[in-house]
A protein has these predicted regions:
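Acidic, glycine-rich active-site loops and adjacent beta-strand->loop/helix elements
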Residues: 20-22, 76-87, 107-112
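Alpha-helical metal-binding/catalytic segments enriched in His/Glu/Asp
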Residues: 16, 37-85, 124-129, 148-157
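Residue-level signal for beta-strand positions within conserved beta-sheet cores that form or flank
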Residues: 32, 72-74, 121, 165
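Acidic/His- and Gly-rich active-site-bordering loop/insert found
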Residues: 1-46, 67-72
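Active-site-proximal flexible loops/turns
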Residues: 26-28, 57, 88, 115
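Midchain, well-structured core segments that form catalytic/ion-binding scaffolds
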Residues: 85, 91-171
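Residues at alpha-helix caps and immediate loop-helix transition turns in enzyme cores, especially N-
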Residues: 54, 90-91
């Protein structure tokens, strides 16, 4: 975790927090997802909305306060995390080594304002082999991202399987 500071008169600090890490890029990109580009007036690249754009916003806010606000009553810190997408151990490390701010705001969401995280659940589902017909099963590239596709390789008689949209049967 890194940070940028503006001094203030009080020892009581306020902060913003954003993150610079991203989930894996997934499928469907028509250009390198890690190269920022402009298309039709929009910035495109992995993590622009979550959360590099808000990170830049916080740094510009500090620059604005430095240039336009005059002396600040409270010091302001822009925290830039690098571990939000997995377990936020960087924040735990920060809190163990630095005094946490009395107020911390994150612009990591769309309007209207939200005041909480949806929570997370992570599990490994393990089953004994029931009949040996499932040879492989995959879905997604990261535990914390909704997969855009899934696949299963099964052993079965082709004639016994019904045709269905979105399912490819191969012999």
């Amino acid at each position: 975790i890194g940070y940028a500071d503006l001094p203030g008169a009080s020892p009581t600090q306020i902060a913003t927090i954003t993150h610079l890490d991203v989930v894996p890029e997934g499928n469907g990109w028509d250009a390198d997802p890690f190269t920022l580009r402009v298309r039709d007036g929009w910035l495109l690249g992995r993590g622009v909305a979550d959360d590099k754009g808000p990170s830049v916003l916080c740094l510009y806010a500090l620059k604005f306060l430095k240039d336009e606000a005059g002396p600040l009553r409270y010091p302001v810190r822009a925290l830039l995390g690098c571990n939000e997408e997995t377990n936020m151990k960087d924040v735990a490390w920060y809190n163990a080594h630095e005094k946490p701010p009395v107020f911390c705001f994150t612009p990591d969401a769309e309007f209207p304002l939200c005041n909480g995280e949806k929570g997370q659940f992570e599990a490994d589902l393990i089953s004994p082999v029931l009949n040996g017909d499932i040879l492989d099963f995959e879905g997604g590239v990261a535990r914390n991202a909704v997969p855009d596709r899934a696949s299963a390789l099964i052993r079965a008689e082709l004639a016994a399987l019904p045709a269905a949209e979105g399912i490819t049967l191969e012999q």
